[in-house]
A protein has these predicted regions:
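Glycine/threonine-rich flexible loop motifs
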Residues: 27-30, 52-60, 224-226, 298-302
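ATP-dependent carboxylate-amine ligase
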Residues: 40-41, 66, 95-98, 111, ...
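Short active-site oxyanion
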Residues: 74-78, 240-243
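Substrate-engagement module of ASCE P-loop NTPases
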Residues: 64-72
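Short glycine-dipeptide loop
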Residues: 72-76, 284-285
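Active-site flanking residues adjacent to catalytic metal/cofactor-binding acidic residues
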Residues: 18-21, 44, 80, 188, ...
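Short, polar loop motifs at secondary-structure junctions
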Residues: 82-86, 104-105, 248-251
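Extended acidic/charged loop-beta regions that coordinate divalent cations
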Residues: 1-49, 88-130, 167, 172-174
Length: 314
């Protein structure tokens, strides 16, 4: 968070914000880490099957999320994504804390979204204000609604929350522009799950319109390396014009998985060849969207450097 204090700085604020972690606590405690947090305000944004190295199925993760919900006090608040069936099942297991939902047909809604990212905020059907920011995609609007609801619960007025979001600068590695060379823009995003890939590509598409998107993917997470999500990749990348996938060190064949979009997908097992192919394909007006939950061996700068060499030689 560019605008937040450094992690090692203590604040006089009584509030502490943490991203929940559903991985197991320790070898002797297989409960998810977040059952130890005991939050007063809990935001449940989305819940899908992931972390196949420790969870057998989605039901196992839902069970852990229900453990979390049960730790929120009666005077607290659960802010939940009303569009997620998995979260609806979690709440239905039993929740003794007030719940506010966000999303279409929910307590909190985003209305009149614009191509520049801005939108109106509705609560209980009443317009509360207008968020004027440049973050793209439905997932960012959902994040905004959740943060407004959570802030309201701890005493921040909706008006102030909306004003703060309008001044918000996006976090690192979320559609972060790493550079531009001769009209080719290189983005970096942490997306590594098919749903996140879908929303990230769709968000960029809403910004660039019909201009080309060159999606560059490293399936690096444990779940992706196991191949659990491989069949969902073609659909998640469908809005990209070209797809470059780094297939080294996978337990499955990326070319086979991407066969449904083979007309626009290329798989490489070495980074040098992949960067060369990306740069050869790129032209002015294109967006290169790099998606990985790791450093990807500095591929962003490699692409930018190679683009500089390409266009300076023309």
């Amino acid at each position: 968070l560019p605008q937040a204090p450094k992690q090692d700085q203590n604040s006089v604020s009584p509030f502490f914000v943490i991203e929940a972690d559903e991985y197991d606590t320790a070898f002797f405690d297989k409960r998810s880490k977040f059952v130890h947090y005991h939050p007063r305000t809990a935001v449940l944004n989305n819940l899908e099957f992931d972390h196949a190295d420790i969870f057998d199925d989605l039901a196992a993760i839902e069970k852990q999320f229900h453990h979390l919900v049960r730790t929120v006090p009666q005077a607290g608040l659960v802010v939940s994504n009303g569009l997620e069936d998995s979260l609806q099942r979690v709440i239905a297991k039993g929740c003794w804390t007030p719940v506010e939902q966000f999303g279409s047909d929910s307590d909190w809604q985003a209305a009149n979204p614009q191509s520049n990212g801005s939108f109106d905020v509705l609560f209980a059907g009443e317009r509360q204000g207008h968020v004027a920011w440049d973050l793209l995609g439905e997932h960012n609007r959902m994040n905004a609604l959740a943060s407004i609801a959570a802030a309201r619960h701890v005493g921040v007025s909706v008006k102030v929350a909306i004003e703060a979001l309008s001044q918000f600068k996006n976090v690192k590695r979320r559609m972060e522009i790493r550079g531009e060379v001769h009209g080719v823009t290189v983005y970096d995003d942490f997306a590594h799950h098919p749903t996140a890939i879908t929303t990230t590509v769709a968000g960029l598409r809403s910004k660039v319109g019909k201009a080309r998107i060159l999606a560059v993917l490293e399936p690096r997470s444990n779940t992706m390396k196991l191949g659990v999500m491989k069949n969902a990749l073609p659909a998640s990348l469908s809005e990209a014009d070209l797809v470059f996938c780094y297939g080294a060190d996978l337990g499955w064949d990326a070319s086979t998985a991407l066969a449904p979009i083979q007309h626009k997908a290329q798989v490489y097992n070495d980074l040098v060849s992949m960067v060369s192919a990306i740069v050869a394909a790129a032209s002015s007006g294109d967006s290169v969207l790099v998606m990985s939950n790791g450093g990807f061996d500095g591929v962003h700068q490699k692409i930018l450097d190679a683009l500089t060499s390409k266009f300076s030689a023309e």
